[in-house]
Amino acid sequence: LQYFINTYNELNIIPMVHIDDNDSLHNMESFILSQSKKGRSIAARFPININNIDEYIKIITSTMTVNQKLFIILDSEQITESNIDEVIANLQLNMAKIKPILNENINAIIAGTSFPKTVADYGDKEGDIPIFEEYIYEKFQEPYVLYGDYASINIEQIEIKGGTFVPRIDVSLENIIFYK
């Protein structure tokens, strides 16, 4: 990673640390400190069900320089009709913990995807897929809270072996994606 960042420094690549409750704090601190010494912006990706986001962020911000930027990515992963209320509840808990520290140098990004693994649940040849991530973002939209999504893809990596690929056109509108 460091070689890549140094080689393409002019591209303003923002290194990201993925954090969950099982991570070693020492490894995270070492990575953040190494990037802070270089004055680079940092992104930290958290699952929305993390228990102590404020403790992790306190560690991160304690190593940051004055003008360094931090992007806190709250990753909702797959959002469906069956889990949207849980996603919103988890985001509310974590936003309440981080909202007091948000400013021009510390931004929150609410990310996720509602694009399904297969569109068959929405119709065989054509259909509409609700864009839940847009709906969720609108609930939390305010200064220093940014929108993020998975660019209309599903979070699962699917290996296609044999079979017939069926081309499809996806069109993203304000609240739905329709496909043909």
Indicate where each model-derived feature is located.
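C-terminal structured domain segments
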Residues: 161-180
